[in-house]
Each structure stands twice: as structure tokens, then as C-alpha cells.
Amino acid sequence: MIRITFSAEQKVKEYSGKVTGFDILQPDVLKEAIAFKVNGELHDLSREIEADAEIEVIQLSDEAGLDIIRHDAAHIMAQAVKELFPNTQITIGPTIQDGFYYDFATGRTFTTDDLTAIEKKMKEIVKSNHRFVREVWTRKQAIDFFSDIGEKYKVDIISSIPEGENLTVYRQGDFIDLCRGPHSPSTGRVKAFKLMKVAGAYWRGDAKGPMLQRIYGTAWRNKDELNAYLECLKEAEKRDHRKIAKDMDLFHIQEEAVGQVFWHEQGYILYNVLESYIRKKLINNGYFEVKTPILVSKELWEKSGHWDKFRENMFIVDESESKKLAIKPMNCPCHVQIFNSHTRSYRDLPIRMAEFGTCHRNESSGSLHGLMRVRGFTQDDAHIFCMEEQVNSETIKFCDLLKEVYSELGFNEISVKFSDRPDVRAGDDEVWDRAEKALLEAVKEAGLSYELSPGEGAFYGPKLEFVLKDAIGRSWQCGTLQVDFILPERLGAFYIGADGHKHHPVMLHRAILGTFERFIGILIENYAGKFPVWLAPTQLAILTITNEADGYATKISNVLKEQGVRVKTDLTNEKISYKIRLHSLNKVPILWIVGKNEVTSKTVSVRNLGSERQESFSLEKAIELLLKSINLN
């Protein structure tokens, strides 16, 4: 007998032999079911349960169900490509955020017309409602099969699997693909999808390997969700920070400094406003600021462990044959050196050490994307050196600070990913128990929702990742807090405890923005360049209608500059309609228009960005309203 526990109802049923999901689920449940979990592991509904198990049904409404449908769509696309272009070889086709892709080796370049034809063929395959059939093959059987049909990339993948180990393939109609699974019951479950674009990709990500063509697609639960996603993409395209930055003259990136930002005047003003804002928050929350070298000897990176784990992403400089230096990819080992420069007491802890640290990482050129992925960046980095019993209170304080910053920057929807202990880790389980408990309690006390990422913590400690949602519903992982038991020990950091003995501090790595570059990119897209007045690079533009108003405009400008207002004065001879259009394109939030009448009456005509309405105010009142809009508090 096999005992099956249905987790949703907490019911137990017994069966005389092996059963599948189709055997044990009711017809109304099967209608919505995509797959099921058997003792926590995802299975196809057709896969046999061979022993006592607890099951959980996965529906399309679940994230796991949607991911399976996207995986189905990748296989359907591969089948469609093979039917239309038989000489194409298939490689890999995983799911990604919002969709899927498949890499193909082919002598042709896929065109827009090809994508249309592939999509049409996919719809035919969906309509055919082929069953997804899981088969277990031996390694030799799989190599022989894929060799016979000329799929050398599949053979390459299988060859890396240990001899004697079985593998699984999935069959849909006449098409067979190597795959771990699971899949939904049939191709007909894929209701709403669209192919998006073609890009180049190297086999196994190796630039020395063959160049493949990658077709990206998206798949959703229904057509309404698909259409909503496509509309969101259109809006995201309008908000592309690279396009807006060009209109606003914020920054540029060029081939001679790939992945590094040339900040223009307006962009650097924005950068400095954000930095000053964060600096003030840090000071008010008990942090002190430091500055550490950019170029650091290989020896320190070896001690910290980064040389072994991170060397491929480091820019290395040979000072001599025997001495190597590396441009720092992160700040943490340098901060430990400052901690170590004095003998510390338990009474000194916690120590909150912050740095706007300039770092460089050798990211592949294909991964670079405007401000969102760069090689040279500045982190709003800080490290908290504390005792183990202080981890909880410091995490609560950090969560409160992060929520305050995100809210004031316009992000009120925040979630947390909690990553607990991986299989390979340092430290004993009791220490991990206490650290994980401290983080979870802090997140709950801060009123933040969280989801668990089992086993995703670093080998040296658990971590929190803070995800914010922007104006068009996209999620961005920005803030982090990571507990580190290992680095202080490796680098000889200690404090004298109440018992008079040396103890290693716990180190909390934390950031709110992540990097200034990426966060500014997110801000640009969130606001579509229309920043709140306090954050805008230029807060006010004073536009003259006639030369007779030049002196009045200049005098106002000087008064406002003395009060810290970022103001520009346009005294050009252009028509006022042109000036309004120009500064509106530059996303200046407030325009003051002055002509002969305003000079005489000591007034200004106020026009806000996005409005065609102009309102006249006395100069005194206009200044009062302006300063009020600038003041965050």
C-alpha cells in the first residue's frame, strides 16, 4: 500500500500500487493542475509515485505553474524551429524572468518574418495538444540518439553527465528534447505567448565558442496578462533611462571607456544630490564615513578569499613580475583594515562604517546595459561590526532606514528575499540558527513581507535582499544585508569582550541603493525623468519674454541660489513658446515666466511640468511655494 497525504486538505488516502497525479486527483482539480510536488520536489502529473508521499498540486495561478508553462513554450518553440528549419541544431532553452529563450545553431539569420512564421507554427503545435511524455534513458542511449539526428550540442551536454547516470528526455509528438522537466500535461496548456527578439549568444557563454542565435519569448497565463505585459514593455521603452538621459543631457557611455559613465553637468548634479541625501541619512543613523584605496595588493585579496573566488572579475595591474595589484571590486576587506587599525572594545560596538566606494568589476561586454550594468560604479556601502547579540537590533535599524529612504525616493512597495544556509557553509549550525532567527525577527518587526530562498545564502552567512517595485510594476533588487562570520576571522579582526578575551566581531555587509549608477537608472525610469522638485537637477527655470525682464530674472535667480535652489535663467532671444518647450523637454519641474508686466507688478507666472496652466503669484508667495516643494520634510 502507498499512503498519499494531500497537503492542502491534510487528508491521507491509501492506494494498492504505484499511482500518478492523474490517478489520484479529482477531475475539477486536474483541469487547473499543471504539475505537483511530491515530497517537495516538482513532478509531472504523469510521473508515478512509488512510495508514501505528501503531495501539493501546482496550478497555473502559482508562480511555479507559470514557470512550467514558460518551459513548455521553450520546447514548443524548439519544435517549431526544427519543423520550419530542419538543418538547425538546438542547444539549451531555459525559463527566465517573464519568459524563456532557446539558443539555436543555424546558418541563417533569423528575421522578423521568421519569428512570425515560428510563432504561427507554435500555435499549430499548441492546437495539436501533444502530450508531454517523460522518458528515462541511459547516457549511451541518449548520446546515440542525438548523434544519429545530428544534434552535436545535445551530445556535448550529455557527455558532461557522469557515465552510468540516467537522464530524462521529453517527447511531444515527433519532437524529443533532453530535459529535466517537469512539464505540464500537454502543449495545449500554453494559451498566451509571443516571440520578442533575436540576439547573439556564445555556446556555454564562452566568447571563443560558436556564436548561436537566441530567440526570446514571453508566455503568460492568459491573453489579458500577455497584453498587459506588452503594454508595460511599451511604457518601459518610453521610460528607457538611456533615451531620457540623452534628452536631459545627463550622461553618456562610449567605446573608449566601455561600461563606465561620463557624467554630464545635469547628471552629476543628480548624482551629488542623491549622495548628499544618503550621507545625511547615514550621519543621522550613527554611521561615520571613510575612504579607502582603489588599488590594493593581491595579498589582501588572497587573505580575504576574493582572489580565488572573484579573480576573473577583477582588473589586475602588474606592478612588477612578483607583485600584482587589483582595482577593488568591493570595499569590505579595506573596511576591516580600518577596524583593525585600533584595538576595539565590546563597548565600542556596534561600529557603523560607511563609504561611497568606487569599485570596478570586469563584466562581460554583452552584459553591459546603460547605467543598469556597468564596470565602474560607486556603492553606498557600509559595514557594521557588532557582537552576535546585536545582529537583530542592527538589522531592525537598517530595515527602518531602508524603508524611510525608499519611501522618500518614491518607492513604497518593498518585499524581501531571505536566503538561508547553503549546503556548503562555514560555521556551526547553532550560529546559523541564531543568525537566521535574528534576521527573520527583524524583517517581521519592520513590517516587511518576505519570501524564502532556501539554500541561497552565502557560505559565510544568511542574507536579505530588498526588492522594490517601480511606477509600472517592475521589480528591482537593490538593497542587501548580509551576515558574515568569516571575513573578520580571516583578516584578524577582533575586539576585547567583557570577559577580557579576544572575540571576532560579526560583520554586516549592507547597502540601500546598491550602486549609485544603477539606482539613478531606476529613478530615471520610475519618474520618466520627471523628478520630484527636491531631486531634480534643475529645480526651476526662469524664462524671460522680453529683454526688459533680464535684470529682474537675474536678480530673482541670485536670491534663490543663495537659498540653495538649483535655478537656471534663460535670457535668450527665442520665443517664449520655444523656451517653454525646451525646458519642458529637459524635465524642469517648475517654470517661472517673466515679462514687462511681471517686472512692473513684482510677480511671476508659474507653470508646472506637464501642465499648460499658468498662474500668477507675487514673487514672495512664489518663493514660499517653491521652497516648500523642495523641502522633503
Curated annotation (Swiss-Prot):
CDD domains: TGS_ThrRS (cd01667), ThrRS_anticodon (cd00860), ThrRS_core (cd00771). Belongs to the class-II aminoacyl-tRNA synthetase family. Residues 240-532 are annotated as: Catalytic. Catalyzes the attachment of threonine to tRNA(Thr) in a two-step reaction: L-threonine is first activated by ATP to form Thr-AMP and then transferred to the acceptor end of tRNA(Thr). Also edits incorrectly charged L-seryl-tRNA(Thr). GO terms for molecular function: ATP binding; metal ion binding; threonine-tRNA ligase activity; tRNA binding. Its cofactor is Zn(2+). NCBIfam families: thrS. Residues 1-59 form the TGS domain. Homodimer. InterPro entries: aa-tRNA-synt_IIb (IPR002314), aa-tRNA-synth_II (IPR006195), aa-tRNA-synth_II/BPL/LPL (IPR045864), Anticodon-bd (IPR004154), Anticodon-bd_dom_sf (IPR036621), Beta-grasp_dom_sf (IPR012675), TGS (IPR004095), TGS-like (IPR012676). GO terms for biological process: threonyl-tRNA aminoacylation. The gene is thrS. Binds 1 zinc ion per subunit. Its main location: cytoplasm. This is Threonine--tRNA ligase. The keyword Lipoprotein does not apply. It is found in: Cytoplasm. GO terms for cellular component: cytoplasm. It comes from Wolbachia sp. subsp. Drosophila simulans (strain wRi). The keyword Nucleus does not apply. Zn(2+) binds at C332, H383, H509.
